[in-house]
Amino acid sequence: MEFTPISPPTRVAGGEEDSERGAAAWAVVEKEHMFEKVVTPSDVGKLNRLVIPKQHAERYFPLDAAAGAGGGGGGGGGGGGGKGLVLSFEDRTGKAWRFRYSYWNSSQSYVMTKGWSRFVKEKRLGAGDTVSFGRGLGDAARGRLFIDFRRRRQDAGSFMFPPTAAPPSHSHHHHQRHHPPLPSVPLCPWRDYTTAYGGGYGYGYGGGSTPASSRHVLFLRPQVPAAVVLKSVPVHVAATSAVQEAATTTRPKRVRLFGVNLDCPAAMDDDDDIAGAASRTAASSLLQLPSPSSSTSSSTAGKKMCSLDLGL
């Protein structure tokens, strides 16, 4: 199996233009994407090695210990003994990177060791970044390997809301009612509403206002009023009827007996008592009638017991 030697791009004094030419040449090369890996903290740590997933390593970078050389599937660069291979890659600027690739029996993993730490430092890789590997297609790019990377996606800005404290409960002992604490009101972040014309306007505001992402808007929901319990006060209805009954009983009753109208006191409610009192009054008045001289005194005495109305 023959491999095309990779000639690194020539660096001149004003290396900026050469880098641009290398990037342009790298972009026009037809490449096949092989695999990519999200680097872990151990991949960019002090171990100075990159672990290649086993399925990708055996497919694209197989090791042939018997032949002492490898590079199936487009492995580029020189070979090595039983210690592994040296693979050469090109980045997007056309710069060549050489990594020692081998198999570790202790961890049973395929790793890239020598040269990897320099790539991490120069590209400033961090945990979560993605490293991708590719190979050239066609006669012009056959046997060339490519390496690239991209930064991890920044997490969407999370809104930190201050904790909402429930308002203190107030109790009115005079009215015997208690107000429970109101539930906390959720906060909603400021949202940008875009009209059909493409302008961003804050909700409820005119054009030209651009709300900041750090602002917040409070949306208050109507609260259901708490139930109020009043202390019941007993009402005595019997008092009104007693007053009405007392008013009716204070009126004197008039009875006509033997042609005489008698006004009896209100305390005598029983008919038998009224009749007995009337008969006694009539008898006493008849006994006093023959004495003309005592008519005045008898009438005065009769008024004390009950008023007489002689209808004779």
From Swiss-Prot:
Superkingdom, taxonomy of origin: Eukaryota
GO terms assigned for molecular function: DNA binding; DNA-binding transcription factor activity
Pfam families xrefs: B3
Swiss-Prot/TrEMBL keywords: DNA-binding, Nucleus, Transcription, Transcription regulation
Ranges for region Disordered: 161-182, 286-312
DNA-binding residues: 35-153
Bias kind Low complexity: ranges: 286-301
SMART domains in UniProt: B3
InterPro entries membership: B3_DNA-bd, DNA-bd_pseudobarrel_sf, LEC2-like
GO cellular component: nucleus
Subcellular location: Nucleus
Basic residues composition bias: residue spans: 170-180
Cross-referenced PANTHER family: B3 DOMAIN-CONTAINING PROTEIN OS10G0537100-RELATED, B3 DOMAIN-CONTAINING TRANSCRIPTION FACTOR ABI3
Protein name: Putative B3 domain-containing protein Os10g0537100
Native source species: Oryza sativa subsp. japonica
